[in-house]
């Protein structure tokens, strides 16, 4: 009598299916390229703008202005909108956990669209995590202010935000495609 497949055997089968050659090579190339570009830009912008930050991050410095975006440099010990600034352990945990979950989903992704957006999410979160870890003060450097707003973001925050929007739109497109196929 055949044994029923266990949870782990099903999981292994899904992992192997989602990571077969040559798809795996394209997947890894996309992940490494997008991840490198995001982390490189995060740290290049930090290096370029770190000297512009006010003393201990208390005062921001207005670096450049345009009609769409301004560069205003400030340190931020919290997550988005300076939430949890007084709980650094929770901030590290949330950013690390978000990165781990995103990287976990990458293992099972078979769509280049999802791979791109999940990679952008994972490395945006990792960019903030490593930025905070290497800053010496436990803060990220925020510098983008979009017109009509008062909130200050960095490139990693933008990657996280755009990846959630991209994933949502990808899910909607896939949902409507599947709905259309079931009707015909």
UniProtKB/Swiss-Prot annotation:
Family annotation (PROSITE patterns): SPASE_II
UniProt catalytic activity: Release of signal peptides from bacterial membrane prolipoproteins. Hydrolyzes -Xaa-Yaa-Zaa-|-(S,diacylglyceryl)Cys-, in which Xaa is hydrophobic (preferably Leu), and Yaa (Ala or Ser) and Zaa (Gly or Ala) have small, neutral side chains
GO (cellular component) term, any one: plasma membrane
GO biological process terms held by the UniProt record: proteolysis
InterPro entries to which the protein is assigned, alphabetical: Peptidase_A8
Protein's UniProt keywords contain Protein biosynthesis: no
Protein family (similarity comment): Belongs to the peptidase A8 family.
HAMAP family: LspA
Job description of the protein: This protein specifically catalyzes the removal of signal peptides from prolipoproteins.
Protein name: Lipoprotein signal peptidase
């Amino acid at each position: 009598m055949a044994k029923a497949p266990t949870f782990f055997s099903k999981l292994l089968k899904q992992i192997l299916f989602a990571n077969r050659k040559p798809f795996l090579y394209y997947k890894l190339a996309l992940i490494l390229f997008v991840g490198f570009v995001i982390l490189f830009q995060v740290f290049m912008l930090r290096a370029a703008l770190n000297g512009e930050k006010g003393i201990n991050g208390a005062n921001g410095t207005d670096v450049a202005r345009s009609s769409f975006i301004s560069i205003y440099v400030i340190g931020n010990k919290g997550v988005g909108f300076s939430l949890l600034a007084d709980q650094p352990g929770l901030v590290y945990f949330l950013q690390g956990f978000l990165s781990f979950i995103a990287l976990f989903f990458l293992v099972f992704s078979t769509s280049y669209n999802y791979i791109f957006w999940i990679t952008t999410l994972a490395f945006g979160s990792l960019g903030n995590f490593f930025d905070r870890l290497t800053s010496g003060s436990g803060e990220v450097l925020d510098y983008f202010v979009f017109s009509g707003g008062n909130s200050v973001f960095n490139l990693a925050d933008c990657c996280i935000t755009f990846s959630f929007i991209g994933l949502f739109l990808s899910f909607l497109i896939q949902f409507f495609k599947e709905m259309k196929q079931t009707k015909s």
